[in-house]
Curated annotation (Swiss-Prot):
This is RNA-binding protein 28. Gene3D superfamilies: 3.30.70.330. Nucleolar component of the spliceosomal ribonucleoprotein complexes. Residues 700-715 have a biased composition (Polar residues). Residues 689-698 have a biased composition (Basic residues). There is a cross-link at K653 (Glycyl lysine isopeptide (Lys-Gly) (interchain with G-Cter in SUMO2)). It comes from the Eukaryota. GO terms for molecular function: RNA binding. Keywords: Acetylation, Disease variant, Hypotrichosis, Intellectual disability, Isopeptide bond, mRNA processing, mRNA splicing, Nucleus, Phosphoprotein, Repeat, RNA-binding, Spliceosome, Ubl conjugation. Residues 84-105, 201-330, 594-759 are annotated as: Disordered. The keyword Iron-sulfur does not apply. Pfam families: RRM_1. It comes from Homo sapiens. One of its GO terms (biological process) is mRNA processing.
Length: 759
């Protein structure tokens, strides 16, 4: 605050805070401005203070502002006034000692956040042993084992971690575990006075607690007396401060009450008492109750303390009135927002930096738990204007295109702060959650209408294409199963020469400013009819691209769509979010699951399951073997008659033409693409199947083999004919009927007449 605060000296007695603020607001936004006045009157004492929000405005004000209503004024950077509680001992003490005290206090407050207490500690355990045990959970900043005046250990210790996450892991991992042969109890460390308050609940310790409260009240009262004496002495010191330009926080607070300017301390207290909407009302009620209980306890302590003089009683009453005074509520102004789902490690400075993009902030306050002093995961923030608060609410809504506000990897939930009565009503009413999952708001993304500014310079052919695509989109979206994808883009009007690599490069360049851009799919659609070998088909002029994140897809769409600099002004890309069919996506998931099951079953069994299609090569080999076996089994007479018969066509087995889906519906069976090249070898008709790998044998050897096979087959057939004459007779009759009905084939050789010696 001191670096942003200016000390303004040599002001006339008629100077007012409003006039001073009007003068300095010409340089930049003024956060705070007041003129120090005489007690009991509005006359200016000749100096004042101005606080800016930005350091640049402070530098400008030092250079530009030199006069006030025609009078020359002194403008310097205000110095922080450091008070020493023992002023009576000497005002000439070195100022370095009091500077160290507030820093030490701040460090203690920060340390409490990630600090653990280890009870029931063994006397054999040293600080180094304790550090080595807890170092496995994270960075240990400090280890402390308190000792008695005689040097013996007290049986407990403290471990300070770097952040809350590591401390939480250590608490879960080491609670009720043994260290040096002794089971320890690990818990969050709290302030000593709060621990004593919790321990003084029993009836036995009530008297002791009253005595301690009495002592604390006497101490507080003594501090208040010193503060009141210091305030009285401030009148003498302010003249020196005017020359030195010293800035005092306490003077500022007292004088702000008189000048009706909001104090920073009041703002922070007001943040704690802020009631929250439905889900956040519990936090706000607890905080407000704590504030009220604190003020009541202070009043009781002042009432119990025995005052020696009437002046001390008057001062105590004044202090209690100040504490009990209700602060004005700023909920109805619509400038305060309540933030939920905060990370426990998030700080007020980080949250303030995130919210400053929407407008100037009055305060940011993270709600702390009263016992542990850890963050509750929620906060309050008040903007200077109502418009800034509305901008913040719009940016944080989940329906926003940017995806809402994120801090430390968590999605922030922002709502307007409401009164306690409204919060109670919101708890009873159930909020209807949006059920739309079709993302129809993205259907208009990339739309360019004729006659608009975006349509200037677009060729008539491109506009006709856009109108046609828009009409098709409207027709498809009438089906409830069609939805708009959030990550998949459809790109039309692409040149024929653009391939997958060029398109991927274009999309990555469009999202070059983003971090972690990943394209899952990028495919230019091509005509595959009449294409063989490694030849690529001609591009169809459109493509699909799928991103990992919605924000990246949205940025690529807005940069590439209708951009004349990519492919020229006459051929501008038409980019829109792709339409998806839920039914087809379900079918795709089922196919993937089946393939995964097949892959898992193969290494387990080593053989394909029943009903699974075999590879094409195995099918061909098995078919050839089966064919040769059948030929060897057929008797020679049937072979001769079969040779004379004509081709009877394919003899196929009845196959299922429809496939039943899991939802009960049926669809036509889709045959898979062939896994081999060349002419189709059909397994349904065995009439003209060639051997798999035919070899050209020598003619003499081939004839000798044929004769040998005929002799062997005749011998086998004679043996079988004796055993089963009825079957051979039936086959002969069938062959005779075939010859009569179909006639002998042209290419078939004439049947040999039986010789006289065969009978």
């Amino acid at each position: 605050m001191a670096g942003l605060t200016l000390f303004v000296g040599r002001l006339p007695p008629s100077a007012r805070s409003e006039q001073l603020e009007e003068l300095f607001s010409q340089v930049g936004p003024v956060k705070q401005c007041f003129v120090v006045t005489e007690k009991g009157s509005k006359a200016c004492r000749g100096f004042g203070y101005v606080t800016f929000s930005m350091l640049e405005d402070v530098q400008r004000a030092l250079k530009e502002i030199t006069t006030f209503e025609g009078c020359k004024i002194n403008v310097t950077v205000a110095k922080k006034k450091l008070r020493n509680k023992t002023k009576e001992k000497g005002k000439n003490e070195n100022s370095e000692c009091p500077k160290k005290e507030p820093k030490a206090k701040k460090a203690k407050v920060a340390d409490k956040k990630a600090r653990l207490i280890i009870r029931n500690l063994s006397f054999k355990c040293s600080e180094d042993d304790l550090k080595t045990v807890f170092a496995q959970f994270g960075a240990v900043l400090e280890v402390n084992i308190p000792r008695k005046p005689d040097g013996k250990m007290r049986g407990f210790g403290f471990v300070q971690f770097k952040n809350l996450l590591e401390a939480g892991k250590a608490l879960k991992g080491m609670n009720m575990k043994e260290i040096k042969g002794r089971t320890v109890a690990v818990d969050w460390a709290v302030a000593k006075d709060k621990y004593k308050d919790t321990q003084s609940v029993s009836a036995i310790g009530e008297e002791k607690s009253h005595e301690s409260k009495h002592q604390e009240s006497v101490k507080k009262k003594g501090r208040e007396e010193e503060d009141m004496e210091e305030e009285e002495n401030d009148d003498d010191d302010d003249d020196d401060d005017e020359e030195d330009g010293v800035f005092d926080d306490e003077d500022e607070e007292e004088e702000n009450i008189e000048s009706k300017v909001t104090k920073p301390v009041q703002i922070q207290k007001r943040a704690v008492k802020r009631p929250a909407p439905a889900k956040s009302s519990d936090h706000s009620e607890e905080d407000s109750d704590l504030e009220e209980s604190d003020s009541i306890d202070d009043g009781e302590e002042l009432a119990q303390s025995d005052t020696s003089t009437e002046e001390q009683e008057d001062k105590a009453v004044q202090v209690s009135n100040k504490k009990k005074r209700k602060l004005p509520s700023d909920v109805n102004e619509g400038k305060t927002v309540f933030i939920r789902n905060l990370s426990f490690d998030s700080e007020e400075e980080e949250l303030g930096e995130l919210l400053q993009q929407f407008g100037e902030l009055k305060y940011v306050r993270i709600v702390l738990h009263p016992d542990t002093e850890h963050s509750k995961g929620c906060a309050f923030a008040q903007f200077m204007t109502q418009e800034a608060a509305q901008k913040c609410l719009l940016a944080a809504s989940p329906e926003n295109e940017a995806g809402g506000l994120k801090l430390d990897g968590r999605q922030l939930k922002v709502d307007l702060a409401v009164t306690r009565d409204e919060a109670a009503k919101l708890q009873t009413t159930k909020v209807k959650k949006p059920t739309g999952t079709r993302n129809l708001y993205l259907a208009r993304e990339g739309l360019i209408r004729a006659g608009t500014k975006a349509a200037e310079g677009v060729s008539a052919a491109d506009m006709a294409k856009r109108e046609r695509f828009e009409l098709l989109k409207h027709q498809k979206l009438k089906d409830q199963n069609i939805f708009v994808s959030r990550t998949r883009l459809c790109l039309h009007n692409l040149p024929k020469a653009v391939d997958d690599k060029q398109l991927r490069k274009l999309l990555l360049s469009a999202t070059s400013g983003e971090k972690g851009v990943r394209i899952k799919e990028c495919r230019v659609m091509r005509d595959l009819k009449g294409v063989h070998g490694n030849m690529k088909g001609q591009s169809l002029g459109y493509a699909f691209a799928e991103f990992q994140e919605h924000e990246h897809a949205l940025k690529a769409l807005r940069l590439i769509n209708n951009n004349p600099e990519i492919f020229g002004p006459l051929k501008r890309p038409i980019v829109e979010f792709s339409l998806e069919d839920r039914r087809k996506l379900k079918m795709k998931e089922l196919r993937i699951q089946r393939s995964l099951q097949k892959m898992r079953s193969k290494p387990a069994t080593g053989e394909p399951q029943k009903g699974q299609p075999e590879p094409a090569k195995d099918q061909q080999q098995k078919a050839a073997q089966h064919h040769t076996e059948e030929q060897s089994k057929v008797p020679p007479e049937q072979k001769r008659k079969a040779g004379s018969t004509s081709w009877t066509g394919f003899q196929t087995k009845a196959e299922v033409e429809q496939v039943e889906l899991p939802d009960g519906k049926k669809r036509r069976k889709v045959l898979a693409l062939p896994s081999h090249r060349g002419p189709k070898i059909r397994l349904r008709d065995k009439g003209k199947v060639k051997p798999v790998h035919p070899k050209k044998p020598k003619p003499q050897i081939n004839q000798w083999k044929q004769e040998k096979q005929q002799l062997s087959s005749e011998q086998v057939s004679r043996k079988k004919a004796k055993g089963n004459k009825t079957e051979t007779r039936f086959n002969q009759l069938v062959e005779q009927y075939k010859q009569k009905l179909l006639g002998p084939s042209k290419g078939a050789p004439l049947a040999k007449r039986s010789k006289w010696f065969d009978s």
